[in-house]
Amino acid sequence: MNTSRFILALLISLFITAPINAQSIREQDIRAELGFLASDAMQGRGSGTIYERIAAEYIGSQFQQFGLEPGGDTDSAGNKSFVQRVPVQTAPSGATWNTIGILRGSDPGEAIMLSAHLDHLGVNEAAPGDDKIFNGADDDASGSVAVIELARGLAAGKKPRRTIYFVCFGSEERGGLGSRQFIDNPPVPLTQIVADLQFEMLGRPDAKVAAGTLWLTGFERSSLGPELARHGAALVADPHPEQHFFQRSDNYPLALRGVIAHTVSSYGLHTDYHRASDDVSKIDFPFMTRSINSLVKPVQWLANSYFRPAWLPGQAPTPRPTR
């Protein structure tokens, strides 16, 4: 066993969390999962590093425990993995990694997607102060944990009508390399994905919205947000339109390809963004647990309904013209 494989196996064996109660989304599981992904041992999950791969494998191990179908690479023996290797020549390890789990629905022609990015900024020896590890607890270990826990909750229910893809992308911090690979080589035609909810920075409440509320980027662009809110989701419009968050996560390249794709967040512009101080100690776990739980029934409705969201007139994103 080479060093990289040994580190991967050791860390996952130390931190893997068993689904003690697979039907409920509990704070203790969220603490364990986020505590692993944002631990110093994970060295900031730098894009394209062995630690990003460990994060991908860990998330895949959770998906496996919930009974999801693997949607990643197939090895020479024909065995399917939850992890998808994406060659990247400029990455430290020569690749980045996505994790894909599938909850198969009864209608093979339609799917929804729940996604996040699993990487962060790694280690920066030039950073001021003693802490050089950018743990990325909020950005975006919190989003990855939301995907894990929604997989837990949804897999424990009845088989949905629409297939649900649970996807954690690698190298978002390096320009969305993982999501680009997914879009260019999707496991299902993009026309069959009726909606994607990307989860980004859900670890702390945003004081600009009501208590217990999450916000949706591009809320005014499509019929998805209002309809989810009508079915119980505590979702409101992004209170920071000047930040252009709709265009700043992995939802955007999907949206440019026609998928109704938005980001769910509660980021209140805290000062730990992209700093070594984005640590587990700053996470509001009761808020995060309530937030994830609040989305289970609305997502179940979306997975079982015949509602197909659409861009509102004049609101579909279009690529910027090249000069």
Task: Identify the residue ranges that each predicted region occupies.
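Bacterial N-terminal signal peptides
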Residues: I7-A18
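Extracytoplasmic/secreted proteins, especially bacterial periplasmic and envelope-associated proteins
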Residues: I25, D29-A32, F36, I50-Q65, ...
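Acidic/His- and Gly-rich active-site-bordering loop/insert found
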Residues: L37, F63, T90-A127
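Second-shell loop/turn segments in exported
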Residues: D40-I50, P87-Q89, T99, P128-D140, ...
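A non-catalytic alpha/beta surface segment that caps or lines the substrate-entry region
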Residues: R45-L103
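Alpha-helical metal-binding/catalytic segments enriched in His/Glu/Asp
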Residues: G101, L114-H120, N124-G175, L295
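Metal-dependent peptidase/peptidase-like ectodomains
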Residues: G109, K159, F169-T263, Y267-D272, ...
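His/Asp/Glu-rich mid-to-C-terminal helical/loop segments that flank catalytic regions of hydrolases
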Residues: T271-R323
